[in-house]
Curated annotation (Swiss-Prot):
This is Proteasome subunit beta. Keywords: Autocatalytic cleavage, Cytoplasm, Hydrolase, Protease, Proteasome, Threonine protease, Zymogen. Its main location: cytoplasm. Pathway: Protein degradation; proteasomal Pup-dependent pathway. The gene is prcB. The active site is at T53 (nucleophile). Residues 1-52 form a propeptide. GO terms for cellular component: cytoplasm; proteasome core complex, beta-subunit complex.
């Protein structure tokens, strides 16, 4: 195997050449084959891959909640019951994805490194708008793969330190970015989740209320969309729920979400019509 440091034990020139503070730009110069969208040229559309499904985000005074179901599907089969589709992006933001699971996970990892790399190089963090724009550029880079069936779209949310508010950004496969002021959902169950959120959202939601309606929206999506997984009480698999406020990012523990799920199931048992 060739020595990556070379005969003299030095790093290759690409590592020493001044460039931008973007890790994705550096990767495109030094190892472009490692970028998520670099593997185009497939013989045809790809279908037999796992897909992540429904993510929701809800803004409330003082922050934002993001929640995702745990199911990944492959065709008509359940590929995984405990997949995690909501992730920490940096100290004041989170990101989730819907679509091809492998590409989505790779995109999230690259985005996390991108934000960390910028902070280390520049000694400061990107603004929330700049983070959203960096993510849009990565989504655009995956367009060739998306056109061959390996599509993934993220949902990005965070706490804006400049305005003191939680903000939500959604994307399409061509990287068009939209800011949602109240709530948003992506994935196969999003139409049902949005309908649920539309009925329950209020501008004065508390953090606990925002968690409740987010989990309830996923419950409603799972009720009508077979690709969205509902809470699995037997296996103790509950939605991944994260909050971002002025105190930063925090993921809720399962034992915090369990009573929320229990309360929803109890309420639904007395109102079987939903």
């Amino acid at each position: 195997m060739a020595d990556p440091l070379g005969a003299a034990g030095r790093l290759p020139a690409v590592f020493m050449t001044p460039g931008t503070s973007s890790f994705a730009d550096f990767l495109s110069r030094s190892a472009p084959h490692l970028l998520p969208g670099a593997r185009s040229g497939l013989p045809g559309p790809v279908t037999e891959v796992a897909h992540g499904t429904t993510i929701v985000a809800v803004a409330f005074p003082g922050g934002v909640i993001m929640a995702g179901d745990r199911r990944a599907t492959q065709g008509h089969m359940i590929a995984q019951r405990d997949v995690e589709k909501v992730h920490h992006a940096d100290d004041y933001s989170c990101v989730g994805y819907a679509g091809t699971a492998g590409v989505g996970a790779e995109l999230i990892r690259l985005f996390q490194v991108e934000l960390e790399h910028y902070e280390k190089i520049e000694g400061s963090t990107l603004s929330l708008d700049a983070k959203a724009n960096r993510l849009a550029a990565m989504v655009k880079g995956n367009l060739p793969m998306a056109l061959q069936g390996l599509a993934v779209v993220p949902l990005f949310a965070g706490y804006d330190l400049d305005t003191g508010k939680g903000r939500i950004f959604s994307y399409d496969i061509a990287a068009a970015k939209s800011e949602e002021r109240t709530y948003e959902s992506i994935g196969s169950g999003s139409v049902f989740a949005k309908g649920s959120l539309k009925k329950r959202f209020r501008s004065d939601l508390s953090q606990d209320d925002a968690v409740r309606i987010s989990v309830e929206a996923l419950y409603d999506a799972a009720d009508d969309d077979s690709a969205t997984g509902g809470p699995d009480v037997i296996r103790k698999l509950y939605p991944i729920v994260a909050v971002v406020t002025a105190d930063g990012y925090r993921r809720y523990a399962d034992d915090e979400i369990e009573p929320v799920v229990t309360a929803i199931i109890a309420d639904r048992s007395t109102n079987s019509g939903g």
